[in-house]
Amino acid sequence: MNIDISNLKVQCMGEIANVKNLKELEEFQIKYLGKKGIVKNMLKELSTLPSDKRAQAGRQLNELRDFIESQINELRKKFEEEEKQKRIQKERIDVTIPGKRVEVGAIHILSQVQKEISEIFLSMGYEIAEGPEVELDYYNFEALNIPADHPARDTQDTFYISDDVLLRTHTSPVQIRVMKSKKPPIKIISPGRVYRSDEVDATHSPIFHQIEGLFVDKGVTMADLKGTLEVFAKRFFGEETRVRFRPHHFPFTEPSAEVDISCIFCGGKGCKTCKGEGWIEILGAGMVHRKVLANCDIDPDEYTGFAFGMGVERIALLKYEIEDIRLFYENDLRFLKQFR
């Protein structure tokens, strides 16, 4: 071993005094303490020394290694603290700078209305059921007693993905799925998005929202349906609201009716909104058709039921006197902020 250990220590002290940052410190550590470093190589050469000098040289090398490690550790702490302080200064927040106003979001008006409608029916013992928006023709049409030649199946009215797959045109398929998977009594509402091939205008949109209801049990009558919808109308539109049923036709209910409420703007006296009639249509309803019950393996001689369906957008338009359905979808904050 030809290197003088005492001189090597002086050399180390001189070099480490010139180390200015963590990168240079890493290079210094590798040079002296790395696998191929100076100290490591000197330790390997100890075996070449005479036995009477080997112990002393080994002790001196260990002391040198410990000294270098202590110097490295002290410098590392120093440099890390310096970098930390630099980072703190760089990221420092000036609390005297005026803050930026954070815009607080709110629930969309359609979500508010859907929730309000749902909560009324939930309070009457209904449960919420959901289903896929991409639906099979069977659940959307066939099981609901809508034959192949029915106008509703026209490609001009329905978004078909393939011959038997489509975007649901109503949330009624949820009712079929529930009736096929559950035995009566069944008492559900099914809110959700639906799709129809309509031109966009003030009252139509190809995507809109519905809430449909279904109650199936023994002894359910039209009187139960009328009472249920009267409760809903009075709670949602006000206690003075009156309800009337007009005969109509739906393939999935028999008898069927369109349901009107007394005009909430003129009290039934006649105005521009109700076109002078004093009544405004809000939904369709009826007794579940025997064939629909049979399609779901429910005995129509033992069970009866009623169903109803309403458009959330239509209800919102009426309640808030909004004239154009497109306002719901344009994300204009000037409009949406009115319903916080």
UniProtKB/Swiss-Prot annotation:
The record's free-text note on cofactor binding: Binds 2 magnesium ions per tetramer.
Leading EC class: ligase
InterPro entries cross-referenced by the UniProt entry: aa-tRNA-synth_II, aa-tRNA-synth_II/BPL/LPL, Phe-tRNA-synth_IIc_asu, Phe-tRNA_ligase_II_N, Phe_tRNA_ligase_alpha1_bac, Phenylalanyl-tRNA_Synthase, tRNA-bd_arm
Family annotation (Pfam families): Phe_tRNA-synt_N (PF02912), tRNA-synt_2d (PF01409)
Catalysed conversion reaction: tRNA(Phe) + L-phenylalanine + ATP = L-phenylalanyl-tRNA(Phe) + AMP + diphosphate + H(+)
Principal location class: cytoplasm
Keywords on record: Aminoacyl-tRNA synthetase, ATP-binding, Cytoplasm, Ligase, Magnesium, Metal-binding, Nucleotide-binding, Protein biosynthesis
SUPFAM superfamilies given in the database record: Class II aaRS and biotin synthetases, tRNA-binding arm
GO biological process: phenylalanyl-tRNA aminoacylation
Residues binding Mg(2+), per UniProt: 254
EC number(s) stated in the UniProt entry for this protein: 6.1.1.20
CDD domains per UniProt: PheRS_alpha_core
Necessary cofactors: Mg(2+)
One GO location term (cellular component): cytoplasm
Domain of life of the organism encoding this protein: Bacteria
Subcellular location: Cytoplasm
GO function term, MF aspect, one: catalytic activity, acting on a protein
Family designation: Belongs to the class-II aminoacyl-tRNA synthetase family. Phe-tRNA synthetase alpha subunit type 1 subfamily.
Assembly and oligomerization: Tetramer of two alpha and two beta subunits.
Alphabetical list of PANTHER family matching this protein: PHENYLALANINE--TRNA LIGASE, MITOCHONDRIAL, PHENYLALANYL-TRNA SYNTHETASE
Protein name (database record): Phenylalanine--tRNA ligase alpha subunit
Species in which this protein is naturally found: Caldicellulosiruptor saccharolyticus (strain ATCC 43494 / DSM 8903 / Tp8T 6331)
